[in-house]
């Protein structure tokens, strides 16, 4: 049986990266929430 997680850096950046987050309103919400929380890493 094939596992669901097949790591791939390009896809990782494209779907969860900073620029991807900034593209949508909700993504910006995520970044701001993480800023408020004081996360060391805002995005992948």
Curated annotation (Swiss-Prot):
GO cellular-component term (any): ribosome
Keywords, sorted A to Z: Ribonucleoprotein, Ribosomal protein
Record flagged with keyword Ribonucleoprotein: yes
The keyword Ribosomal protein belongs to this UniProt entry's keyword annotation: yes
Ranges for region Disordered: 25-44
Biological processes, Gene Ontology terms: translation
GO molecular function: structural constituent of ribosome
Coiled coil: none
Signal sequence segment: none
Family: Belongs to the bacterial ribosomal protein bL34 family.
Protein name as annotated: Large ribosomal subunit protein bL34
Organism: Nitratiruptor sp. (strain SB155-2)
């Amino acid at each position: 049986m094939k596992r669901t997680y097949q790591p791939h850096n390009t896809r990782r950046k494209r779907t969860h990266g900073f620029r991807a987050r900034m593209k949508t309103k909700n993504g910006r919400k995520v970044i701001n929430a993480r800023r408020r929380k004081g996360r060391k890493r805002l995005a992948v």
